[in-house]
From Swiss-Prot:
Gene that encodes it: ahcY
Organism per entry: Pseudomonas aeruginosa (strain ATCC 15692 / DSM 22644 / CIP 104116 / JCM 14847 / LMG 12228 / 1C / PRS 101 / PAO1)
Higher taxonomy: Bacteria, Pseudomonadati, Pseudomonadota, Gammaproteobacteria, Pseudomonadales
Cofactor binding, per record: Binds 1 NAD(+) per subunit.
Compartments it resides in: Cytoplasm
Broadest EC class assigned to this enzyme: hydrolase
Name by which UniProt lists this protein: Adenosylhomocysteinase
GO cellular component: cytosol
Function text: May play a key role in the regulation of the intracellular concentration of adenosylhomocysteine.
Length: 469
């Protein structure tokens, strides 16, 4: 590693290639111009230094946009140590730029599972000893789980966790229910300016981009099956429809299924009469035999299971835009079928057996990103303007929890404060306003009479917590 581009003597990092730092810095500067909410918070709070004294363990995709988030946290007074939450999602030039700025980061694209866990451990440890961290910023919950299982003593100093994604929120809620969560958390995922931007509009932008980069296929006129119609599924379905695909949706939630119908998508099930009894006989082979592309979007396990994979049309593309690779039964694929790497993060999965394959045989599936996040494995993820809302939420959530000083409270008070909550709506609206300003939009202010008539403050919040946007 070159020491030329980093502060003298700084070695507290591991990235693929530190010489990529200048490239990364150029991209960071462009990203800043596309992240008005995040940069607005940086300007607004720089003088107050609300995160002075905060020591943040971060585990989120090490992209260019994350670089802007990291430098915003630092600009507001925090110290950070960073790793990526996915083995394929790091942009190496982004990691290099952050390392060159003297910020500890441990991430590179194409980590093994062992290297991934090692990188997380390096953020937790400094000079071989647990760092005196007092905040956690997580995406997916792996960092949170490692802290609870291997370093529980560190939780005594930690004021809280901010969690970015659906999967991580599910894990936090399970921990809270089971009595194993030791510190409060903010569910950033369900902030409106996160879920409606990142999950929906971000996937609308980045899914088709990733599939086209990975396969060079024309998508129009082909049939796609999107598994799940939550916010991610909604954006994904729109993304494929934009390409001219014939999109079908599979859902378990009647409300989401109804929304898919109302949006003009045919709601189908890969199982006969919607019943999965675990046998091949329960599969709707006639349906799956016509599907050219299957996308999982749920955050649940085995929603594209082994029997579905057996029944899929030859040469169908299979990918996931949820969080972990267990949405698709990749374990079955590894155990029973031969894998042929076409290029990084693109594999032909030969269904003719495990021990070998005929390269000219056409009974294969094309698996993208090994079943992990396709938009970050095969492309660069959501654009900066989308991540602006998500990361502005993260900054405000970190400030909010850090100000609460949970770790300093008496035991009785801690018991009352232990929860998983969404960011207060007023802060959500603050993020939204900065985003609107970034588009050059002008928001109309209520008159006092109008505000009184609908029972809100002129300054907001403007909707009750029960309002569904």
């Amino acid at each position: 590693m070159s020491a030329v581009m980093t502060p003298a003597g700084f070695t507290d990092y591991k990235v693929a290639d530190i010489t990529l730092a200048a490239w990364g810095r150029r991209e960071l500067i462009i990203a800043e111009s596309e992240m008005p909410a995040l940069m607005g918070l940086r300007r607004k709070y720089a003088g107050q230094q609300p995160l002075k004294g905060a020591k943040i363990l971060g585990c989120i995709h090490m992209t260019i946009q994350t670089g802007v988030l990291i430098e915003t946290l630092v600009a507001l007074g925090a110290e950070v140590r960073w790793s990526s939450c996915n083995i394929f999602s790091t942009q190496d030039q982004a990691a290099a730029a952050i390392a060159a700025a003297g910020i500890p980061v441990f991430a590179w694209k194409g980590e093994t599972e062992e290297e991934y866990e090692w990188c997380i451990e390096q953020t937790i440890l400094k000079d071989g000893q647990p760092w005196d961290a007092n905040m956690v910023l997580d995406d997916g919950g792996d960092l949170t789980e490692i802290l609870h299982k291997k370093y529980p003593q560190m939780l005594e100093r930690i004021h809280g966790i901010t969690e970015e994604t659906t999967t991580g929120v599910h894990r936090l809620l399970d921990m809270l229910k089971n009595g194993t969560l030791k510190v409060p958390a903010i569910n950033v995922n369900d902030s409106v300016t996160k879920s409606k931007n990142d999950n929906k509009y971000g996937c609308r932008h980045s899914l088709n981009d990733a599939i086209k980069r990975g396969t060079d296929h024309l998508l129009s006129g082909k049939q796609a099956l999107v598994i799940g119609y939550g916010d991610v599924g909604k954006g994904s379905s729109q993304s494929l429809r934009q390409e001219g695909m014939i999109v079908k949706v599979a859902e378990v939630d009647p409300i989401c299924a109804m929304q898919a119908c109302m949006d003009g998508f045919e709601v189908v099930s890969p199982y006969k009469n919607g019943i999965n009894d675990g046998t091949e006989a329960s599969i709707d082979a006639a349906l799956l035999g016509k599907i050219d592309l299957i996308v999982t979007t749920t955050g649940n396990v085995n929603v594209c299971d082994a029997n579905m994979l057996k029944a899929l049309k030859k040469r169908a593309v299979v990918c996931n835009i949820g969080h972990f690779d267990n949405e698709i039964d990749t374990a079955f694929m590894r155990k029973n079928w031969a894998w042929e790497e076409v290029k990084p993060q693109v594999h032909k999965i030969h269904r003719t057996g495990k021990d070998g394959f005929d390269a000219h045989n056409d009974d294969y599936l094309i698996l993208l990103a090994e079943g992990r996040l396709v938009n970050l494995g095969n492309a660069t993820g959501h654009p900066s303007r989308i991540m602006d809302g998500s990361f502005a939420n993260q900054v405000l959530a970190q400030i909010h929890l850090f100000e609460q000083k949970y770790a300093d409270l008496p035991a009785a008070e801690k018991a009352k404060r232990l929860s998983v909550e969404v960011l207060p709506k007023k802060l959500d609206e603050e993020v939204a306003l900065e985003m609107v300003k970034g588009f050059g939009g002008v928001v109309t202010q209520l008159t006092p009479k109008q505000a009184e008539y609908i029972g809100v403050s002129v300054e907001g919040p403007f909707k009750p917590d029960t309002y569904r946007y």
